[in-house]
């Protein structure tokens, strides 16, 4: 690449070509780094998210205008259902769900805690009275139960106080597998149920 004599050093033709090529590569690398920095500062593209119906209605959709104002180049495809999705098979980037992670090959991050409260419609309580203990629900009242869209398994009403734990599975007048329909059923006076505190605030 270099010609050396006792008095001077000159660049060979191959050396000059090597230098020119290296300068172009370094310039290209600088351009790539600049574009990546810009991409991080201004993310763009399509984002496929799947969330439960109540989460979509009460937590996600009300904040999408603010999200798009901050990230105008992101296109959101929002799937809304209470069923479990296959991230790979359904080509979904992100899922927001409550509960335990069933697939240990997935990466999960806790984004909050859900507080469930026991509720009933005023009309139901006027008709049936207000229970003073969870066992009264099983003995004297009707409950509205949520069941899994996948397995069909009923989720009990769960009561915890210290070391005491009571699960109520019935009797129920209605079992529902969609969260908005579940809340509507309770509001309609069909029985006692458990919903999140932010659902109750609505």
Which residues make up each language-model segment?
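A short LG(V/I)-centered, amphipathic sequence patch enriched
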Residues: 1-11
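A secondary-structure boundary/capping signal
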Residues: 5, 51, 81, 120-121, ...
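Short acidic-rich active-site patches of cyclic nucleotide enzymes
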Residues: 8, 46, 113-114
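Alpha-helical "hinge/linker" immediately C-terminal to small N-terminal DNA-binding modules
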Residues: 10-38
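Central regulatory/effector-binding core of bacterial HTH transcription factors
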Residues: 44-107
């Amino acid at each position: 690449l270099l010609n050396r004599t006792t008095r001077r050093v000159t660049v060979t033709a191959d050396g000059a070509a090597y230098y020119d090529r290296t300068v172009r590569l370094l310039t290209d690398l600088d351009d790539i780094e600049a574009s990546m920095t810009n991409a991080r500062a201004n993310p763009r593209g399509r984002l496929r998210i799947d969330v439960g119906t109540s989460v979509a209605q009460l937590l996600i959709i009300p904040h999408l205008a603010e999200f798009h104002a901050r990230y105008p180049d992101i296109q959101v495809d929002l799937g809304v259902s209470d069923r479990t999705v296959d991230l790979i098979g359904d080509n979904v980037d992100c899922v927001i769900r409550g509960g335990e992670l069933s697939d240990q090959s997935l990466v999960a991050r806790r984004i909050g805690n859900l507080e469930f409260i026991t509720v009933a419609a005023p009309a139901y309580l006027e008709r049936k009275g207000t229970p003073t203990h969870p066992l009264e629900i099983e003995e004297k009242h009707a409950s509205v139960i949520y069941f899994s869209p996948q397995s069909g398994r009923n989720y009990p009403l769960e009561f915890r106080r210290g070391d005491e734990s009571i699960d109520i599975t019935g009797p129920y007048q209605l079992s529902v597998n969609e969260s908005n329909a579940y809340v509507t059923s309770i509001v309609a006076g069909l029985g006692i149920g458990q919903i999140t505190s932010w659902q109750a605030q609505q």
